[in-house]
Amino acid sequence: MADSEKIIDLPERSTPEVEPVIGDIRQDWDRVRLGVEAILQANPKLSFRPEDVYAEVVAGHAIYWKAPEGFVVTSIEVDGFTSEKTFYIWLAWSERRGQKNVLKYQDFFKRIAHEVGAVALEVRTTVPCMKALLTETGWYIGEVVYRYRLKDG
């Protein structure tokens, strides 16, 4: 992950059972791999492989959070010009879609982002219904990325 900060030194904390906890991706890899494969199948233009997610977490560049419904993988992105940190929710997967888990855990991740010195939360998605869900709850569209694939490239 470009411009990400190594975050393995995140302080341990006790959390209520209803909140996500930092998981051991090695121990949970079979479940996580299935979730990442489902994300990639639904979004074939994503460029990473399941093993890349595993490697980022093991290397300390991302954190794997497990929750009863599924999992989230986050990282910290640092702006190269301002040095501001953004708490980036890279992947989120649940066994049952449509449960609005992003809202259920929003306050938790806002708290964690604040604790690590981030100035914002960020998600990137190709799921159209997420726009309404997020913008109705205080999120805004920071940018729209258009891509043109070169035939020779």
Predicted region positions:
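Active-site rim helix/loop that mediates acceptor-substrate recognition in acyltransferases
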Residues: 42-63
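Short amphipathic alpha-helix that is part of the acyltransferase structural core
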Residues: 2-48
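Active-site/acyl-donor-binding loops of N-acyltransferases
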Residues: 2-4, 123-153
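Acyl-donor binding region in acyl/amide transferases
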Residues: 84-137
